[in-house]
């Protein structure tokens, strides 16, 4: 959510500078990442609304199974990244506990998409 700015209009900043090919990835993968992030932060109704509008505008056929795959993947990656903090000696035990809670929440979310 740190790359979504709310002002007069919603602006989504996604600037991949290190690999030009990555800039042109599957749009559905990017939408799935944002949907997962919204749901993680309690914005399920916003996620549902965005998905409805995307689906109506993109007119892609039967992409829900692929959407769920991308959402599982992104949630697992976020959970994994948070899990890495547990072994970081520079992070306080309180911050490690928070990282564990975030990781659990991401892994639980991933499981919900896989059902």
Listing of model-derived features with the role each one plays in the protein:
Residues 2, 6-7, 69, 101-103, ...:
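In a subset of proteins, long, contiguous C-terminal domains/tails are tracked
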Residues 23-26, 64, 95:
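Pocket-edge positions in alpha/beta enzyme catalytic cores
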Residues 1-28:
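Active-site acidic catalytic loop and adjacent metal/ATP-binding pocket
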Residues 80-115:
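ATP/Mg2+ or Mg2+-diphosphate-binding catalytic cores
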Residues 60-70:
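All-alpha amphipathic helical-bundle segments outside canonical DNA-binding/catalytic cores
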Residues 17, 24-58, 73-90:
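Active-site activation/catalytic loop segments of kinase-like enzymes and analogous catalytic loops
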Residues 68-75, 99:
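Amphipathic alpha-helix face/heptad-repeat signature
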């Amino acid at each position: 959510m740190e790359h979504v700015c709310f002002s007069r209009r919603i602006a989504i900043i996604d600037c991949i500078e290190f690999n030009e090919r990555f800039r042109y990835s599957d749009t559905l993968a990017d939408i799935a990442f944002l949907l997962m992030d919204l749901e993680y932060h309690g914005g399920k109704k916003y996620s549902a609304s965005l998905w409805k509008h995307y689906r109506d505008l993109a007119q892609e056929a039967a992409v829900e199974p692929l959407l769920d795959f991308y959402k599982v993947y992104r949630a697992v990656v976020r959970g994994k990244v948070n899990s890495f903090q547990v072994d970081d000696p520079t992070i306080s035990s309180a911050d490690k506990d928070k990282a564990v809670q975030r990781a659990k929440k991401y892994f639980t979310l991933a499981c919900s998409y896989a059902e």
